[in-house]
Amino acid sequence: MTAFVFAHGAGGHRDDPGMRALSKLLADLGIEVVRFNFPYREAGSKRPDPMPVLKASMRKEIERERGGRLLIGGRSMGGRVATMLAAEGLACDGLLLFAYPLHPAGQPEKLRDAHLPQIEVPVLCSNGTRDALCRRDLMERALEQVKAPWRMHWLEGADHSFHVLKRSGRTDAQVLGEIGEAVSRWALVHD
């Protein structure tokens, strides 16, 4: 069985609706999902811990899951933490990223991509085309430096929370289904 250590985003927690929906989707694909809260959430705070604390917390959760096939990743900030650990050489079989925060909202000049070329494992990253934290052109440029097999799955019309506008003719449930199909295809190739 494949285990996936799944970290939440800065404004979320292990049991927020987005985390639960993605976890169910992955579990339905036969992936054992391991969710956890970062220390600041456990303490009742909404302010994220410094990156070294976030990385140590996720590393601790990952160490509990050693033994089989291991994927790591997360939503937004949680995915960023996972990419930093992978770039530092943490052993895993791949990364699943949802709404990777390439830059702060409204600040596309502050890219969070310097570590990405150090990643050596396969990556599947799903981002919405309306994500204010990940301009598509900037992500595509950043990935030119990445040697690992990195698959971007762009969700047409979706925002950072994977919500779509009614006028798009799509529903959030359809977007979630599209993510499931992308993960299923990716897992077949990288299993």
Which stretches of residues belong to each language-model region?
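Serine-hydrolase catalytic machinery in alpha/beta-hydrolase-like enzymes
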Residues: 1-70, 162-172
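Short beta-strand immediately N-terminal to the catalytic nucleophile in serine-hydrolase-like folds
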Residues: 72-74, 98
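Gly/Ala-rich beta-loop-alpha elbow adjacent to hydrolase catalytic centers
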Residues: 74-78, 82
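A conserved short beta-strand
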Residues: 91-103
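Short beta-strand/loop motif that positions the catalytic acidic residue
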Residues: 119-120, 125-127, 131
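Acidic catalytic loop of the alpha/beta-hydrolase fold
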Residues: 129-134, 160-161
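Catalytic histidine neighborhood in serine/cysteine hydrolases
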Residues: 145-163
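Catalytic active-site module of serine/aspartate enzymes centered on a nucleophile-bearing elbow/loop
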Residues: 166-191
